[in-house]
Amino acid sequence: MVNVSVLSPVDDKKARLKHLIQRLPNLPGVYKMLGKNGDILYVGKAKSLKSRVNSYFAKTIDHPKTRALVARIHNIETIITRSETEALLLEQNLIKEYRPPYNVLLRDDKSYLYVFISADQPYPRLAYGRGKVNHQKGCFFGPFPSAHAAKETLVLMQKMFQMRQCTNTFFKQRKRPCLEYQIKRCRAPCVGLVSAEEYSEDVNNTIRFLKGDSSDIHSALIEKMEASAEELDFEKAVFYRDQLSMLREVQAKQAVYTVQGEADVIAIASQVGMTCVNVLTVRGGRVLGGKNYFPDVDSSQPLADNLSAFITSFYFQVTDDLPAEIMLSHELPDQVAVSEALASHFGSKVVIKTNVREHRAEWLDLAKLNTNNALKTKLGDYLELHARFGALKDVLADITDRTIDRIECFDISHTMGEATIGGCVVFDQSGSRRRDYRQYAIHDIVGGDDYAAMKQVLTRRYKKQPLPDLLLIDGGKGQLGIAKEVLTELGMLGDTLLIGVAKGEGRKAGLEVLHFIDHEPLDLPMDSKALHLLMHIRDEAHRFAITAHRKKRDKRRSSSVLEVIPGLGEKRRRDLLNHFGGLQQLLGASQQELAGVQGIGPILAKTVYKVLHE
């Protein structure tokens, strides 16, 4: 591996870059596009460095992101590698290290969810979480492409096999069964209501089911049900009968996926400049679910090239699980190199296929169908959003010639001045930018003073952040005046368009009035696409702010009554809530039960009981 940095003495940027490219080798390697200050804008890999880098400067480049990247390039550095596989691995390592802005291929790079069964306790716990937690010993099952799929599996396992889900701390402190036992989702091993042997059977059945081996469970449950009935232990017989009934119901739903196998099935499609990739996850012969991605790629490029870029980003940056097979809708131009790089990165062999038959062909057809449907829906939403932005531009034509691309909207939420939260949501012409959403906890104001809250939020945000093209305030002239005051103090007035959206006559939805600083209020018809856009953004700001407020309020209310008790610190408060499962259960506890909690004792228990029941 050789580092090459070609710096030309030529001053003119265009000529200098052309001179630089001419001197690049026709060898595999990695290239780094550098900005004016030496910052890394983009990292890529190539079979031939000279050909790949030269392609960025072709006159036929149409993708706006690529054109924007090329306009910012001031220098190019390359690293020669021994093979294309080595280049691919190095590319992904550099992307992880530097996070270049133009390498953002996948917006949603959360790690996938796994169902986990612990192995370091006599009564193992069933749980789920993102990624494989290295320090935890046990069995991981997945990945599940959505939180819904993981939670649904967890609930199903609870109903069928009744394993505990509580934390180890909560488990150790129990003196009586919790609510999960009452609703038949746990057999209460914490208080000895199930033997270690019986619980171990439930654990083994859960593991077998998650591995896709439910036929053995079916036979074993029939045997146990019949044996319990012969021994006149009808309670156990009913328990096994219920498990058997639920298992049959699940098997009937999943009969189409009874073939064994672990695979990721990936299909790509493109239409009108938009690209969609569907990843279908198959584990133990069962489809666990699918997830759609809309990577920011140049849709004019061949689908196979974009699929190759997606796959390397997906397996190196998003998931930490490599199945035995990857089935693709298109054959990759660098399929061998990708396969070798994945095998090297994960330490296990993977087979990449495009020509598949029988059930694998059905999986691939399913992925293609999901891709096309998701693309159609997303494209429809995008075109509608684009039309709404266009309508807004027309409505504001007499007020501003500013291009409206980024819109930020603020809302204040509280309950009679309690737990005041300011919420900020962000939209552009591609939709909501959830990663840019922010919530602000409001301090040091008179409770219920919305003007003071809005002033604090706007000041805190725009002291550090640049202004959007349009700043939307949920409120009328009063809130708009506060926004004007803040921007004046920050020396930013005039750098953005300020609009206040207030409910019109009778405060009815659809009769909103737009307020401006230097223009008369504007009433838009109820069918106005511009009004629909602003109402949608305003409603999203309200939803975001009120959700954050309720969460903060409920958390404060659940702990505030305990905070006034002398001698009850944060750890003891947490222990009490964990032990009884919440404030309501704590209120129903006797003084003796309170004293039984570790660290409380009879004296403190008396004080706690007295305060809670005054």
From Swiss-Prot:
GO terms for cellular component: cytoplasm; excinuclease repair complex. Its main location: cytoplasm. Keywords: Cytoplasm, DNA damage, DNA excision, DNA repair, Excision nuclease, SOS response. Residues 26-104 form the GIY-YIG domain. GO terms for molecular function: DNA binding; excinuclease ABC activity. InterPro entries: DisA/LigA_HHH (IPR041663), GIY-YIG_endonuc (IPR000305), GIY-YIG_endonuc_sf (IPR035901), GIY-YIG_UvrC_Cho (IPR047296), RuvA_2-like (IPR010994), UVR_dom (IPR001943), UVR_dom_sf (IPR036876), UvrABC_protein_C (IPR050066). Residues 215-250 form the UVR domain. Pfam families: GIY-YIG, HHH_2, UVR, UvrC_RNaseH, UvrC_RNaseH_dom. The keyword Transcription regulation does not apply. GO terms for biological process: nucleotide-excision repair; SOS response. It is found in: Cytoplasm. The keyword Cytoplasm applies. NCBIfam families: uvrC. HAMAP family: UvrC. Belongs to the UvrC family. The UvrABC repair system catalyzes the recognition and processing of DNA lesions. UvrC both incises the 5' and 3' sides of the lesion. The N-terminal half is responsible for the 3' incision and the C-terminal half is responsible for the 5' incision. Interacts with UvrB in an incision complex. This is UvrABC system protein C. The gene is uvrC.
